[in-house]
Amino acid sequence: MQFQSVGNCAPCKDPCPLKSFCDPGLSNTCNIQPFVNPFGPRRAVATWKVNYLISNRNVLAAHCDPDLINPWGIVIYNNQLWVVCNNTDSITNYDLFGNKLLGTISIRNASHNPSYPTGIAINCGGGFSISTGNISRGGLMLTCSEHGTCHSFNPVVDPLHSFIVLNQQITGEVSVYRGLCIANNTLYLADFFQRHIDVFDQNFNRLIGYPFVDNDGSDPIPLNYGPSNIVNIGCFLYILWAKKDPNITLYAVDEPGAGYISVFNLDGSFVRRFTSRGVLNNPWGMIPAPAECGFPPGSFLVGNHGDGRINIFDCNGRYVGPVLAMTGLPLVIDGIRGLAPHYTDFSEIYFSAACDEMTDGLVGSLVKDQVIYF
């Protein structure tokens, strides 16, 4: 069976070297055959070993970093891990083995109060500039926060501090940004509280005319859901919806079947519903699954914060199965948030997790262990 793309993908303007790996419409140029074939008479499935690299507690991982509490977004840049820590208002930086590199990078608001940062995105293009003194550079990384702020960071400008570039509190609008992405020098922010996507250009001017309305009339997304994250994969934007806590609508609830994923064009026009409810449980992390690691070409990995599972979907949103642990049972990582594949050699998939009711933090990696047959 051939995997179909979700649409005709126009060439992207981003000079990002990862586009060839991120676009589900592109073929596996290395001609590596996947180990997982969910449509065959037998299933050969890869199992995965978990490497516990960093935690805020000595007993949980190989390395200890007290700043790693309630981590959310995680990215790999220049073969280094960059992790957003919600409870310590910081970005922490490690090599791929878990050794800490730069000092902790502060993400505080203007009055130095907590901002509770969440998502992080690498800026592959120009723009999103910050400056101090005589130094001005484009933002290397952008983060967002639950207090409705967006921060830009470049170590050349300041190696230990990010700069506030957007602050919705000033406008009087209550915004809770739980995720962000950058595409074609345009910034997209997922406002969980207001139930919409805020869009800005590279100079932080707000853009209008980006609807981001899920028009699936056969299965409308309930009003008590909000966009918990937005992910740029190829030439499409994927919005992950989570259910709001009825008591505190700033927060999402963990609940089986609580989640939707929608696909949009970069202009905010609706493409289709990717998947609804089912195995979703407060989803947040989503990445293209590397075929080189044994996943079906064009498939996706979606991490559930609610039950700690990572589920596999084909490019049409059909559920393939869970990622399996070494035991052959579904892999469970308590409080998993971000996912970051190592695009250089496809040997590992890194993750962040806010374990123990989000009072602890964990960063680790998944390494393919063996192949089992069903």
Curated annotation (Swiss-Prot):
InterPro entries: 6-blade_b-propeller_TolB-like, APMV_L690. Keywords: Virion. It is found in: Virion. The keyword Nucleus does not apply. GO terms for cellular component: virion component. The keyword RNA-binding does not apply. Belongs to the mimivirus R640 family. This is Uncharacterized protein L690. It comes from Acanthamoeba polyphaga mimivirus.
